[in-house]
Amino acid sequence: RSRDVEKVRAISSADENENNAEPEMKPAIERKGVQFQSEKVLEDELTMRLEAGMEVFGIPLKIYRRRGEYGRQYIFPEGRLDILAEDPDGNLYIIELKKDSGYDDAYKQIAQYIDWFQKHKANGKKVYGIICLNAPDKALIEAVRQDDRMKLFEYQISYSEIR
């Protein structure tokens, strides 16, 4: 049976000493609950999975594409989305990625984006928000629980032995 194996990309930095030591490998995540060093690394990882057709967040999503439009770093009159995705029924998903937990305004931001997209871009389809971050606080968890349009995910890095 097949198992998903998650890989953590490593960032190489050359060691500039005279003995030509091997480059030091620095993980792209830090320990503090395990988090990505930048939102771009998290976004790259998620984009790779969506482009490969992998089911993410328990929903079969693909990155939004229309003539002249692509859903990564999607710019619209109210701001810029990390990722705009859609499900097989054409419902839209606004995905906001945060590398850690210090974003108290994430819920409010996504709620405003959902309202704008529902009014201007949904064409009768539904619009949902997904917030993905490390270690969400209780206030964010409660806000999302009260809003059927939102889902909250905590990312985790795991390793599985292949036998």
PLM regions and their residue ranges:
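Charged, terminal alpha-helix-loop-beta segments
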Residues: 1-163
